[in-house]
Amino acid sequence: MLELLMSGGWLMIPIIACSIISLAVIAERFWSLNEKKITPEQLVPSIWKLHKAGQLDKAKINSLSGSSPLGRVLAAGVVNYSHGREIMKESIEEAGRQVAHELEKFLNVLGTIASITPLLGLLGTVIGMIKVFAAIMANGVGDPTVLAGGISQALITTAAGLTVAIPTMMFYRYFRGRIDGLVIKMESEALKMVEMMHGERE
């Protein structure tokens, strides 16, 4: 396997580096985008109970804000409850945008890797074919082994680039969809809390 990678030439180094970075980002995103960590169950009902009991003090709001991304969004609304429904919603939307931006962390890295690794493979193909034609000019086409190195590099780098790019793009799309779903759920929970606190929902 190592010999196969080595025969791809120096362009295998950035392709392998991209694959390692991609694997690290995918593992980190799987760990970070855990639905139970981001949108814990029963958070809105617990806020409602504290609100009805008059126990939503500054300490509990700070604790809520640090508990999860959803808690941070809801806390932004609770802090501005006394300023009316519209200000409360605006605060929630602002916090929601910040949280959504944080959830998208490293996704651009995956998108970039998915875009550049096929290009690196293509560059390897071009370099390999240049070597083939240079060998033909120097030695003719009588000895196939003279051409083997260039053809091998041309094929291996292309295959390696696509091998990294295809799963990376799949995970990029998967994480993008998961983030969209989490943002929609946070918006729904925040709206529910606003309506409950303003007496529009039980």
Feature-to-residue mapping (PLM):
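Alpha-helical transmembrane segments of multi-pass membrane proteins
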Residues: I26-S32, T163-R178
